[in-house]
């Protein structure tokens, strides 16, 4: 249909892991999120998956953190 939707979520690395962050005032997460098509992003401290990048209006084609294990190698 050509219509893309977006959602607010933790952007995920391969293996269902969050992009960790440690500074709520750093531009790291906003840069990461906007480079992946989101409206904006920030470092969510002590969230559901620890300190991770949370994106606002992230396109559906970008992986997000889902329930289940983070499979680090």
UniProtKB/Swiss-Prot annotation:
InterPro entries: LCN-type_CS_alpha_beta_dom, Scorpion_toxin-like, Scorpion_toxin-like_sf, Scorpion_toxinL, Scorpion_toxinL/defensin. GO terms for molecular function: sodium channel inhibitor activity; toxin activity. PROSITE patterns: LCN_CSAB. GO terms for cellular component: extracellular region. It is found in: Secreted. It holds the Pfam family Toxin_3. Disulfide bonds join 17-70, 21-43, 29-53, 33-55. It comes from the Eukaryota. SUPFAM superfamilies: Scorpion toxin-like. Has the structural arrangement of an alpha-helix connected to antiparallel beta-sheets by disulfide bonds (CS-alpha/beta). Belongs to the long (4 C-C) scorpion toxin superfamily. Sodium channel inhibitor family. Alpha subfamily. This is Sodium channel neurotoxin MeuNaTxalpha-13. The lineage of its organism: Eukaryota, Metazoa, Ecdysozoa, Arthropoda, Chelicerata.
């Amino acid at each position: 249909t050509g219509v893309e939707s977006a959602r607010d979520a933790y952007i995920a690395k391969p293996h269902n892991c969050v992009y960790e962050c440690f500074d709520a005032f750093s531009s790291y997460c906003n840069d990461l999120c906007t480079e992946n098509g989101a409206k904006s992003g920030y470092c969510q401290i002590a969230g559901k998956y620890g300190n991770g990048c949370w994106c606002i209006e992230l396109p559906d084609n970008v992986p997000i953190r889902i329930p289940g294990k983070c499979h680090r190698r």
